[in-house]
Amino acid sequence: MIPIVEVPQTIAVQMNNYRDIFCRSEGFDHVNRYVTGLIISPNKTLQGIYDLQVWEGNKPSRRSMHGSVFEYGWDSTELMKQHRVFVSPSHKGQGREVISLDWTFSHHDRGPEIYGNKKEYDYVEGCTSRFQTVVTAVISNDKLIDGLDVVVQSPNLVESELEYLRMTAQDSYEQMSALQDRLLELLYHQKHKLEYKKRTDIALEMVQQIEQEGLFCEAHYAFDNGVLTLDLTRYIESQGKHWVSEIECSRHINWSGEWQRVDTVAEMLRTEHSESFRHIKVNCRNGETREHWVFTKQVRLKRYGRKRLVIVYDTSDLSGTPRYYLTDALHWESVRVLETWSYRWSSEIFHEFGKQVVGMESAQVREEEAVKRHFRLSCVAQSFLQRATVGESKSERFEFSKGKATIGQRCRKIAREVLRSMLELCKRLFMEGKSTDDVMGMLMPA
């Protein structure tokens, strides 16, 4: 735990690209310090980050920092627009770039009043818990993974409200005030029903915004069957881009003039025409080369039309459960389809990175705007950390990386900058004749 005397240069230089988003310089400084805390503070709540701050002179209150970061002075939507402008040059001319669409759960078991936090069954953990559903759009090449947008899905209250309305319904109302209250309840129910967006709706809006800005002209899309919708695929195709998606085994395709489940077709091919599966080698995003046995063919699906299907086995004897991939790129070979699909897992890395390193699910704020700001600042901090330049480490703990910069080294580099500024302050205060107790009182008040 290192006191933060000033914003480290690595963060300050990159945050200057976002200066126009913030009105007041004092508020901008609070946000800079908050982003720094998201990276180096062990407690990534606002209280934990504020406790590390050191100001010379009058120290701003925690309420002042809370207001600057979560309540006023800037727009988180504009922040993400500027963030996409900031990261876009790093993805041009760097080989294959793919935008992955996905969602994750941000758990808050002790925060029932946090915006978007609902108690439901968590199919990942296999139990009931409280969590927010966070939809993400992530772009990646073979070196960088950057979040393009992060949106918290609002809770679906329609069913519970409808049940309440049914239970409290009356045949008649004797008082006008009671009738007015009932009318308001009905109007609010209709309002919430119209405002609610499914995860697929949010993903489509993200793609529409990204394509309208035109910053990632060469990036295709990858997503799993939970995001796959007709509206999404049609929009991507209308922009002259391609998509790759995994599909469920129950999806029906037109095979020999009949509509059949894709797993039925795969089993028939495996048992009767095993020679139709071709051995290929795929160079994945992480540098690994994987061997697969694949069958690919153009097929027709209901509503989606003609697409390319790829059936994948991992063993030469075609044992195990196959995977099924679909793409609108009819001219792509199976190798290119699977290489593009390997970039879909960048979103999983982004989620894990965000939760473990930059505090994506650490905030305890309740209001909708505050929750959005925290997630989006975590997204910005993640990109900053990847761009921190580090030299070759002489420490034994990083020998395993064989000269390749790790996230731990980048965090350490920023922490060293924070430590250096603290030592410089201590040096100056001691030269001014301050006692050890005076310096301790400034750095870590009792």
Predicted regions and their residues:
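Non-catalytic, well-ordered alpha-helical scaffold segments
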Residues: 29-32, 47, 131, 323, ...
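Extended, non-catalytic structural segments that build the interaction scaffolds
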Residues: 33-34, 316, 320-345
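Conserved, well-structured functional cores that handle cations and Mg-NTP chemistry
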Residues: 1-263, 295-298, 310-311
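Short amphipathic alpha-helical "interface-anchor" segments enriched in bulky aromatics
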Residues: 101-105, 270, 333-365
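A short, flexible helix-boundary coil/loop motif
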Residues: 1-29, 38, 54-56, 154, ...
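Short, flexible loop/turn motifs enriched in small residues
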Residues: 128-133, 305-306, 318-321, 347
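Catalytic-loop motifs flanking and including active-site residues across diverse enzymes
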Residues: 133, 346, 350, 376-379
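Short, catalytically relevant binding-site loops at active-site mouths
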Residues: 228, 250-252, 331-332, 358-361
